[in-house]
Amino acid sequence: MGDREQLLQRARLAEQAERYDDMASAMKAVTELNEPLSNEDRNLLSVAYKNVVGARRSSWRVISSIEQKTMADGNEKKLEKVKAYREKIEKELETVCNDVLALLDKFLIKNCNDFQYESKVFYLKMKGDYYRYLAEVASGEKKNSVVEASEAAYKEAFEISKEHMQPTHPIRLGLALNFSVFYYEIQNAPEQACLLAKQAFDDAIAELDTLNEDSYKDSTLIMQLLRDNLTLWTSDQQDEEAGEGN
């Protein structure tokens, strides 16, 4: 059994044990062998890092909320400790994101040929996602540059997906979902977010008969998430409009 197969086996085992740091480390090593990733390999890489970064994002949100409360309480001593801990989590999160972005630029996006539309969109979406995660914790000039990089990656992926993929394709739908979240949460542009999500949902509904049996479950799940977000976002906007005259 070659190195590559051993690493993949370790990644699958780590996934079953829910040891995502180990899983990410194995998939990073697989990627650095600089051979094309199969769909399964690609998904292993994505799942590993999504869980690794997800744990840090969740911790960061909890600590940020404690920091806000501590600030309001005026407890300076505690605030210093909380702030230092938030910064520690931030550094971990940034390291994970930068690892993924380096793999994408050095190997994955770079090695896609002109006809590997699905892989290209998958990796560009991933690039948009990890710059978005950096944007969640960044501020000032640093935030501006990661926001721009995130939008550029999403836009490039979006153009390729519109030209070469069915509206019901789960990767195209997943991209629309995350790109619309980027507009809503990072750019604070609810109208643009709703427009993008609604267009993606409507386009998919219009071509439901093209739904691939293999991806039916994935596609319909993402369509449901798009619809849930639209419901939430439009009710938020209505609440704001209703409250504007108060």
UniProtKB/Swiss-Prot annotation:
Protein name: 14-3-3 protein eta
UniProt keyword terms in alphabetical order: Acetylation, Cytoplasm, Phosphoprotein
Keyword hit for Nucleotide-binding: no
Organism (species): Mus musculus
The gene coding this protein: Ywhah
InterPro entries registered for this protein in UniProt: 14-3-3 (IPR000308), 14-3-3_CS (IPR023409), 14-3-3_dom_sf (IPR036815), 14-3-3_domain (IPR023410)
Residues with Phosphoserine modification: 25, 59
One GO BP annotation of this record: negative regulation of apoptotic process
Family recorded in the similarity comment: Belongs to the 14-3-3 family.
Pfam families, per database record: 14-3-3 (PF00244)
